Amino acid sequence: MMWQKYAGSRRSMPLGARILFHGVFYAGGFAIVYYLIQKFHSRALYYKLAVEQLQSHPEAQEALGPPLNIHYLKLIDRENFVDIVDAKLKIPVSGSKSEGLLYVHSSRGGPFQRWHLDEVFLELKDGQQIPVFKLSGENGDEVKKE
């Protein structure tokens, strides 16, 4: 008969091996998706603008110490939030002297408009807060707070 298995023919994989294979496959898939989401956020304008502000802020640079390291977002943190018009992030940063979190609040007028920063501040591990950027003025003038 056509469906009969013969000695040496291809047999189905044992259950344990199948579970192991699928576990490795799904874990690898999850890792790739997690990496791609991180990459998506790090290329977004709200993220880039905040990092540029941090890199150009002398007091924050002095507090962290060179070289400045920007770490991956913790995606499971509920305070990291992005929707159509608002983005609120906690970006882990570190340097040779200290480490901390860069708090970012960014917004835009609508889905296809450009992101702009509302507020960026650095909170160091010891609790010190350094204002890096704050949007001020009724007309939306961007003013650094140093």
From Swiss-Prot:
A UniProt-annotated Pfam family: Coa1
Mitochondrial matrix side: 1-14
Signal peptide residues on this chain, from the entry's feature table: none
UniProt xrefs under InterPro entries: Coa1
Name this polypeptide is given: Cytochrome c oxidase assembly factor 1 homolog
Assembly and binders: Component of the MITRAC (mitochondrial translation regulation assembly intermediate of cytochrome c oxidase complex) complex, the core components of this complex being COA3/MITRAC12 and COX14. Interacts with COX17 and COA6. Part of the mitochondrial complex I assembly/MCIA complex that comprises at least the core subunits TMEM126B, NDUFAF1, ECSIT and ACAD9 and complement subunits such as COA1 and TMEM186.
Membrane topology: Single-pass membrane protein
Function of the protein: Component of the MITRAC (mitochondrial translation regulation assembly intermediate of cytochrome c oxidase complex) complex, that regulates cytochrome c oxidase assembly. MITRAC complexes regulate both translation of mitochondrial encoded components and assembly of nuclear-encoded components imported in mitochondrion. Required for assembly of mitochondrial respiratory chain complex I and complex IV. As part of the MCIA complex, required for efficient assembly of the mitochondrial complex I.
Domain of life: Eukaryota
Keyword Membrane among record annotations: yes
Gene that this polypeptide is encoded by: COA1
Positions of transmembrane segments: 15-37
Keywords from the named record: Membrane, Mitochondrion, Mitochondrion inner membrane, Transmembrane, Transmembrane helix
Organism placement in taxonomy: Eukaryota, Metazoa, Chordata, Craniata, Vertebrata
Biological process, per Gene Ontology: mitochondrial cytochrome c oxidase assembly; mitochondrial respiratory chain complex I assembly
Similarity-based family: Belongs to the COA1 family.
Segments on the Mitochondrial intermembrane face: 38-146
Organism expressing this protein natively: Homo sapiens
Main location: mitochondrion
Location in or out of the cell: Mitochondrion inner membrane
Keyword set includes Ribosomal protein: no
Gene Ontology CC annotations of this record: cytosol; mitochondrial inner membrane; mitochondrion
